[in-house]
Curated annotation (Swiss-Prot):
This is Dihydroorotase. Zn(2+) 1 binds at H66, H68, D158, D309. Its EC number is 3.5.2.3. Zn(2+) 2 binds at D158, H185, H237. Belongs to the metallo-dependent hydrolases superfamily. DHOase family. Class I DHOase subfamily. It is an enzyme of class 3 (hydrolase). The gene is pyrC. It catalyses: (S)-dihydroorotate + H2O = N-carbamoyl-L-aspartate + H(+).
């Protein structure tokens, strides 16, 4: 991320409805920013500059624990500038980049190089997840202590999953000794042989499916090993009701957290009937019964966070038959609106819980983010909850356009994003004024 020292002059953001569960804030007030940090919260504080945010909602900046910015290796699909621009447009102020790049982020020099590039090129705070094992091949563990020294926030097997329980157990033990959390993609590839969820929709559409057990078996194994090793483990993109229940069972038995995605909580496997490669994703979209179980687990805090699994793809990788298309969706720019429209407005999730899952919780996970309490980094998202908009290729800042929400009308749109006191995304027009 480029220099984010913020302006030395105080900026008062006036009249927004502030929602910050970490600080117990839920009401109209002012937030004063100075030197890149939150200086004060409360009405009537004087400041040299003012931002009229009346009618808007203000949240701690969203933090995404799971994204693919395709750097290095596939900058034609996404790079640090475009990925961070998409993140900023979606209200994200912090993003964790996954290691399944080309080359894989399995060596200290690659990690430190990407950390330095991100400091220069990213509009938001970008964190690096290094590979759990060399080449993400599931065999030889990486030098995790050296990866941590190079700047890795965590290690992960995302993209392929670790197929050997022995390797996974040893990896957890090593990660624990190195002081690194582990983000796990739970998938048994001996079961995951289809392109979509194995169920009634796949059968009717005539498309080979992958059973839910491909995720559930791997999730159960990961949780058992997490409890045994004491490693700090995060299960990503939970998509089945049983996997969510397993996470709940191990709460208190293991140092485990978990996330689900916007698409697994707002879409279902009925999209298979489109027979469109755009809708292929891994883990696959599930039936309504799984979606309801996952949404309930998110509502109840069993699933801690929402992460997007932002996965850009070139058109030629998605404009294929469903079975041949590359799996993955864009996520940054539509995440909040999809969840607000599909869950909050439908009465299935409170706004406060959504902010906790997108901002406060993942901000604590990465450390020191996700709060508007005085002294915290001035990372925030301003949102117009009343604005309706249609997702289109024209509205997307990403280099790619593989969003499952293309053509859908959503409500709630980010209009401003601040990182370290600096506006990195601004659709507010002439709301900024100077006091005399």
């Amino acid at each position: 991320m480029s220099t984010r020292s913020g302006s030395a002059a105080e900026l008062a953001i006036r009249g927004a409805h502030v929602v910050d569960p970490s600080s117990g804030l839920d009401g109209v007030t002012d937030v004063v920013v100075r030197g890149g940090r939150v200086a004060a919260v409360g009405r009537g504080r004087p400041a040299a500059r003012e931002l009229d945010a009346s009618g808007l909602f203000l949240f701690p900046g969203f933090v995404d624990l799971h994204a693919h910015w395709r750097t290095p290796g596939r900058e034609d699909e996404e790079d640090l500038e475009s990925g961070s621009s998409a993140a900023a447009a979606g209200g994200f102020t912090g993003v964790v980049m996954m290691p399944n790049t080309d080359p894989v982020l399995d060596r200290p020099a690659l990690v430190s190089g990407l950390v330095r590039r991100a400091e220069r090129e990213s509009r938001v705070r970008a964190f690096v997840a290094a590979a759990l094992h060399a080449g993400l091949a599931g065999e030889r563990l990486t030098e995790m202590r050296l990866l941590k020294e190079a700047g890795a926030l965590c290690v992960s097997d995302d993209g392929l999953g670790t197929q050997s329980a022995g390797v996974l157990r040893n990896g957890m033990l090593y990660a624990r000794s190195a002081g690194l959390p582990v983000i796990l993609h739970c998938e048994d590839r001996t079961l995951a042989t289809g392109a979509v969820h194995e169920g009634a929709a796949a059968a009717l559409a005539g498309v080979p499916g992958t059973p839910a057990s491909a995720e559930d078996v791997a999730t159960a194994a990961a949780l058992v090993l997490a409890a045994e090793t004491g490693a700090r483990v995060h299960i990503t993109h939970v998509s089945t009701a049983l996997s969510a229940a397993l996470v709940g069972f191990f709460r208190g038995r293991a140092a485990v957290t978990a996330d689900t995605t916007p698409h697994h909580t707002t879409l279902t496997d009925e999209l298979v009937f489109a027979l469109d490669g755009l809708f292929r994703v891994n883990p696959p979209l599930r039936p309504g019964s799984d979606r309801e179980g996952v949404v309930g687990a998110l509502r109840d805090g069993i699933l801690d966070f929402v992460a997007t699994d932002h996965a850009p793809h070139a058109p030629e990788e998605k404009e294929l038959p469903l079975e041949e298309a590359a799996p993955g969706f864009l996520g940054h720019e539509t995440a909040f609106a999809a969840l607000y429209t599909g869950l909050v407005l439908e009465g299935r999730l409170s706004l406060g819980r959504l902010v906790e899952a997108m901002s406060c919780g993942p901000g604590r996970w990465v450390g020191g983010l996700g709060s508007l309490s005085p002294g915290s980094p001035a990372d925030l998202a301003l949102v117009d909850l009343g604005e309706e908009w249609t997702v289109s290729r024209r509205t997307l800042a990403s280099r790619s356009s593989n969003s499952p929400y293309l053509g859908r009308r959503l409500r709630g749109r980010v209009v401003g994003t601040m990182v370290g006191g600096e506006m990195v995304y601004d659709r507010m027009g002439a709301r900024l004024g100077v006091r005399t």
